[in-house]
């Protein structure tokens, strides 16, 4: 009677395997992986005693901790049946060129339901076996050798639980069928010991595995077992469950989501296609990606809004936010935070919901949480469903990104009228990457008016350059950008842009405040002041009437009409205050600023209209949010105490007031008292930088408080390059108002 050689990789479960083999007539003979040689095993086989081999579980990695196991497998394939368990599977996959890596989950003594193909060692076993797992490594489907096929996976997460050689009688399972908590273990062993010889077919035809050349296994077995799902199918099933659960939560029922949309609680849209085509260079769709089925964890603790700001400030045209939670570790809250983070940028990136969208409800979710577009994957949708979802998305103002992987899918995308098509170089059924996919699909477009994008696997300028030559307008980059140490430099190099030049900062603008007459205004204008401030606060010593303010406004407008300055487009990748200060600096001058303090919004709006103000300065405790309702740019004052405490609101908050004015915290709180605050506090605030810039972009401020012709140069030097304007009032005054010599001296001291 022949025997089963059981190679023990120093694991206690080897005893259980021994017991199962013995109970089904396998006649096991156990030897540890370093206590036998391949020559001895060859002798056993030559003597006709050795009929089959089992490679046991074991700790460690197959290359370093499996002893003779790999050599035994290499020798035995094609000669006799081989079964690998856990470490045994890893040995087989690794030996044949596959990748053994982190499984995406750690399981030690936990059970999972395993679905299988119902043939080979799984012949006549029921589906969804409860199976015990002790491992953190597994075979990676994207690198699985072509000679192997997947035979089983976990139902809930799609991790490979079994593989089979396509030609030889070699089977392996990742889980532990020998455990007392596993179902069907002895049935699996009984199937294995019935196998004969080294190849499928012939006397092994009973188990259903076709011999080489007889074709692939059928899609479904006669016992009703489902065909083995691809990764895409697993994700599809999981997302259906996720959506079903979300729809049952009271706050996110379809009716409540629809009501929220009807109340316009969602952020306003921008045109996705328009944002792509308006980009003067190759449009980069920068992806926020914490993990993936193929790579496992990439940046699991990454902050989505922080990463989004990095991308936006680096020049990304689109920010792709993965919202799938199980495999990609994303969420809808990530997308909403991203949308809010980039909202204040002058030409913000479009926001893409990158997910496996299967229903109108998911499109409603996307719109509610700030998306400008959604991804529709042709491979996941029936043609009619694809058309319905495309039309519905367009009806909400969102032109979808339609993803294809081959010319057949491209035809479906074109048939429904897609305007932006992304070609995924990664086949979502097996997650293999083929960088030529985009080129093949592009050739099938035949010059149609479609914005074509290349998706996935792009990590170098050479990748991008190749596609651009073929007419590709945009590229999606995820992992490479997430891992880049310098996001802006990497993004620019990716699309072939030179490094940004350091442009010297211009000298600050000059604001002469407290203008009380047309004579004061003429002095300031003739001296070269950029901004003139009029006080419109009743009860203060410099307050002027509306009629006087109108006269000053007319004088300012007349002087401005002779200016040759032209508005400039702000940098598309500049933060809020930097872009706003650039816009104000580029306008024809002088500009008239109306100063208000703790007055009603209606009074402010009336004054803007009656006087013709160019800017409004909120000098009291007004809410910053008022800036949204005032039709001209708003300067908000923040008061700095001698100790450096700042009062007045959220000084670095973007998207509301266009400018920040730093003044001393005087007793009256009104300013204009000739008091300065320590300028090192201004430097500290400036160096804190714009939000999202990590201190690399100085916070632009207007410096005020106790400035004079004698000290303004020192103040600018001490505060640093973030001072884009200086504001003076009492420092250039005499008994009767502004003093010509002082005004001229102040402007000269600033300009140098």
From Swiss-Prot:
This is Multifunctional tryptophan biosynthesis protein. Pathway: Amino-acid biosynthesis; L-tryptophan biosynthesis; L-tryptophan from chorismate: step 1/5; Amino-acid biosynthesis; L-tryptophan biosynthesis; L-tryptophan from chorismate: step 3/5; Amino-acid biosynthesis; L-tryptophan biosynthesis; L-tryptophan from chorismate: step 4/5. The gene is TRP1. NCBIfam families: trpG_papA. Keywords: Amino-acid biosynthesis, Aromatic amino acid biosynthesis, Decarboxylase, Glutamine amidotransferase, Isomerase, Lyase, Multifunctional enzyme, Tryptophan biosynthesis. Residues 509-752 are annotated as: N-(5'-phosphoribosyl)anthranilate isomerase. SUPFAM superfamilies: Class I glutamine amidotransferase-like, Ribulose-phoshate binding barrel. Trifunctional enzyme bearing the Gln amidotransferase (GATase) domain of anthranilate synthase, indole-glycerolphosphate synthase, and phosphoribosylanthranilate isomerase activities. Its EC number is 4.1.3.27, 4.1.1.48, 5.3.1.24. Residues 231-495 are annotated as: Indole-3-glycerol phosphate synthase. Gene3D superfamilies: 3.40.50.880, Aldolase class I (3.20.20.70). It comes from Cryptococcus neoformans var. grubii serotype A (strain H99 / ATCC 208821 / CBS 10515 / FGSC 9487) (Filobasidiella neoformans var. grubii). GO terms for molecular function: anthranilate synthase activity; indole-3-glycerol-phosphate synthase activity; phosphoribosylanthranilate isomerase activity. L-glutamine binds at residues 58-60, 136-137. Residues 3-202 form the Glutamine amidotransferase type-1 domain.
């Amino acid at each position: 009677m022949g025997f089963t050689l059981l190679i023990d990789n120093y694991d206690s479960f080897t005893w259980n395997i021994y017991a199962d083999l013995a109970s089904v007539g396998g006649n096991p003979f156990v030897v540890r992986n370093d206590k036998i040689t391949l020559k001895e095993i060859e002798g056993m086989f030559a003597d006709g005693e050795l009929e089959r081999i089992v490679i046991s579980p074991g700790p460690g990695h197959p290359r370093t901790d499996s002893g003779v196991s790999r050599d035994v497998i290499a020798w035995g394939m094609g000669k006799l049946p081989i079964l690998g368990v856990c470490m045994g599977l890893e040995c087989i996959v690794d030996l044949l060129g596959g990748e053994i890596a982190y499984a995406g989950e750690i399981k030690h003594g936990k059970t999972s339901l395993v679905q299988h193909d119902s043939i080979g060692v799984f012949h006549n076993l029921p589906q969804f076996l409860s199976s015990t797992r002790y491992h953190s490594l597994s075979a990676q489907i994207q690198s699985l050798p072509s000679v192997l096929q997947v035979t089983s996976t976990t139902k809930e997460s799609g991790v490979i639980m079994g593989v089979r050689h396509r030609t030889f009688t070699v089977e392996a399972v990742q889980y532990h069928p020998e455990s007392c908590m596993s179902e069907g273990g002895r049935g699996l062993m009984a199937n294995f010991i019935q196998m004969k010889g080294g190849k499928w077919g012939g006397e092994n035809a009973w188990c259903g595995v076709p011999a080489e050349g007889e074709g692939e296994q059928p899609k479904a077995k006669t016992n009703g077992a489902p065909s083995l799902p691809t990764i895409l199918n697993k994700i599809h099933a999981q997302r259906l469950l996720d959506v079903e659960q979300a729809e049952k939560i009271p706050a996110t029922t379809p009716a409540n989501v629809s009501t929220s949309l009807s109340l316009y609680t969602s952020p306003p849209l921008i045109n996705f296609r328009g944002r792509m085509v308006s980009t003067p260079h190759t449009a980069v769709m920068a992806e926020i990606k914490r993990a993936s089925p193929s790579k496992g964890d990439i940046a699991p603790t990454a902050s989505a809004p922080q990463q989004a700001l990095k991308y936006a400030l680096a020049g990304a045209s689109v920010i792709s936010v993965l919202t799938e939670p199980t495999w990609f570790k994303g969420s809808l809250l990530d997308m909403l935070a991203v949308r809010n983070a980039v909202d204040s940028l002058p030409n913000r990136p479009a926001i893409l919901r990158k997910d496996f969208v299967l229903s109108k409800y998911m499109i409603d979710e996307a719109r509610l949480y700030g998306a400008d577009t959604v991804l529709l994957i042709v491979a996941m949708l029936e043609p009619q469903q694809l058309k319905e979802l495309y039309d519905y998305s367009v009806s909400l103002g969102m032109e979808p990104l339609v993803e294809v992987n081959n010319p057949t899918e491209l035809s479906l995308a074109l048939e429904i009228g897609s305007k932006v098509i992304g070609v995924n170089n990664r086949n979502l059924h097996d997650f293999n990457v083929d960088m030529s996919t985009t080129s093949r699909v592009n050739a099938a477009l035949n010059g149609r008016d479609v914005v074509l994008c290349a998706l996935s696997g792009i990590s170098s300028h050479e990748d991008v350059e190749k596609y651009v030559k073929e007419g590709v307008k945009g590229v999606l980059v995820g992992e490479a950008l997430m891992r880049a140490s310098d996001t802006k430099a990497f993004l620019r190099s990716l699309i072939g842009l030179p490094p940004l030049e350091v442009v010297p900062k211009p000298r600050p603008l000059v604001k002469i405040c407290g203008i009380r007459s047309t004579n004061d205004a003429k002095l300031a204008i003739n001296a070269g002041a950029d901004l003139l401030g009029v006080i419109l606060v009743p009860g203060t010593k410099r307050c002027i009437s509306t009629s006087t303010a109108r006269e000053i406004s007319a004088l300012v407008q007349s002087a401005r009409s002779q200016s040759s300055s032209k508005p400039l487009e702000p940098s598309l990748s500049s933060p809020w205050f930097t872009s706003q200060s650039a816009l104000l600096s580029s306008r024809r001058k002088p500009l008239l600023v109306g100063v208000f303090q703790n007055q009603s919004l209606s009074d402010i709006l009336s004054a803007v209209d009656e006087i013709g103000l160019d800017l409004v300065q909120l000098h009291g405790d007004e809410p910053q949010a008022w800036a949204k309702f005032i039709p001209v740019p708003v300067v908000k004052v923040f008061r700095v105490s001698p100790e450096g405490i700042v009062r007045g609101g959220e000084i670095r908050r973007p998207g509301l007031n266009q400018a920040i004015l730093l003044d001393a915290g005087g007793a009256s709180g009104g300013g204009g008292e000739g008091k300065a605050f320590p300028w090192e506090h201004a430097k500290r605030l400036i160096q804190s930088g714009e939000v999202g810039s990590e201190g690399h972009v100085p916070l632009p401020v207007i410096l005020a408080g106790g400035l004079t012709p004698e000290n303004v140069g020192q103040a600018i030097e001490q505060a640093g390059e973030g001072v884009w304007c200086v504001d003076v009032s009492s420092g250039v005054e005499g008994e009767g108002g502004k003093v010509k010599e002082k005004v001229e001296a102040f402007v000269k001291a600033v300009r140098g």
